[in-house]
């Protein structure tokens, strides 16, 4: 059940480290090399280098000795290169010993310390659960979310098997509807590169504005998206946080799937600390999803004057869905709709003329004089003309 809910993230892969005879031999040979290098370089090399070699020797020993205090795993980066990794099985205890037992006042601040409505998950994670004097405070946001943001859930969407053609087609169709409703200006945050590629192939020839993909956080693509007057950006991985698209650049944020974390050796070890799988999901997995969702939501409004629609397409997030309450708890109070027409009206009520003139089928910016001379009957341009007539 855990894997079915959460096998989404593909930014980096973590696999359990299995000690084979060949790996044991290789590790011991590497350890001997590091030890010999410390002896050979002890007179000539700087002390920090000798210390570094000693640390690497000790780290390798964890793997061939199979130290039970550590979770040992292989982490593959975006290019598929593996790294040997070890993390403590009890990080909260280490933090208590290294930090909180020193009785030095500490102030922890972040925009995503809360998971849903509670600080409890982060308090447990950083080892503050047994500390008596822990005070929490949540500052109100200066953003007027109820006025400047609209949350959309699709209505009547059938539950489709994960990664099936039916699900991919549903997502593609909904994205096209929303891009049309918001006249472009869209960021789509995927939880898996495989899903992003599949949807991209379905919609790439149907987009009314330029469509771009960010593979492994390509800064060139992000810069190109910012230069465009109007475009749609498909992104995943690290783009859920740390990228900034202020103003009308992103006026529609689409999240096809809830960002549940993928199972890995660290989470499997955490799972053994809970009596039941359900307790583990509610105490660890759901809070992680809520934090990641809030980080993704943060791409929508970057200044106090920004306006944006946010669409979550996952059927589990919709009213009546399995995680609807958890999703709403993770986000600020927002008006909610299940009608794409409301999304269109929200955008038309809040955007100026320049926003709409950058939307036409050939993806060129169109001013009033050019539009009058074009005589086009393109559906997208007819919608633009109707907008101005209503104004």
Provide a role label for each language-model segment.
Residues 1-361, 365-371, 385-390:
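ASCE RecA-like P-loop NTPase motor cores
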Residues 183, 377-378:
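Alpha-helical interaction segments
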């Amino acid at each position: 059940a855990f894997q079915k809910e959460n096998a989404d993230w593909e930014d980096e892969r973590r696999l359990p480290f299995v000690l084979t005879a060949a790996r044991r031999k290789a590790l011991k040979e590497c350890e001997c090399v590091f030890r010999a290098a410390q002896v050979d370089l002890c007179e000539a090399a700087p002390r920090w280098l000798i210390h570094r070699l000693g640390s690497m020797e000790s780290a390798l020993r964890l793997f061939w000795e199979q130290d039970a205090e550590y979770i040992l795993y292989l982490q593959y980066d975006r290019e598929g290169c593996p790294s040997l990794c070890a993390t403590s099985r009890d990080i909260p205890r280490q933090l208590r010993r290294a930090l909180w037992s020193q009785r030095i006042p500490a102030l922890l601040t972040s925009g995503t310390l809360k998971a849903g409505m509670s600080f409890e998950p982060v308090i447990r994670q950083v080892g503050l659960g047994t500390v008596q004097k822990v005070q929490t405070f949540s500052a109100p946001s200066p953003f007027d979310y109820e006025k400047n943001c609209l949350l959309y859930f699709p209505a009547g969407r059938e539950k489709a098997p994960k990664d099936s053609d039916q699900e991919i087609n549903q997502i593609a169709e909904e994205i096209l509807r929303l891009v049309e409703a918001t006249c472009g200006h869209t960021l789509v945050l995927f939880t898996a590169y495989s899903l992003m590629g599949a949807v991209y192939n379905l919609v790439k020839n149907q987009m009314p504005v330029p469509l771009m993909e960010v593979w492994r956080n390509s800064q060139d693509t992000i810069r190109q998206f910012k230069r465009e007057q109007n475009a749609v950006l498909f992104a995943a991985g690290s783009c859920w946080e740390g990228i900034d698209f202020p103003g009308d650049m992103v006026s529609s944020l689409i999240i096809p799937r809830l960002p549940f974390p993928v199972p890995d050796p660290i989470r499997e070890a955490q799972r053994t600390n809970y009596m039941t799988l359900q307790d583990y999901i509610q105490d660890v997995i759901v809070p992680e999803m809520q934090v990641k969702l809030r980080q993704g939501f943060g791409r929508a409004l970057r200044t106090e004057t920004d306006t944006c629609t946010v669409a979550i397409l996952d059927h589990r997030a919709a009213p009546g869905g399995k995680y609807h309450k958890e999703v709403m708890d993770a986000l600020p109070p927002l008006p909610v709709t299940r009608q794409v027409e409301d999304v269109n009206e929200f955008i038309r009520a809040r955007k100026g003329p320049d926003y709409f003139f950058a939307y036409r089928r050939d993806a060129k910016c169109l001013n009033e004089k050019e539009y009058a001379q074009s005589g086009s009957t393109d559906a997208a341009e007819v919608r633009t003309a109707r907008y101005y007539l209503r104004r």
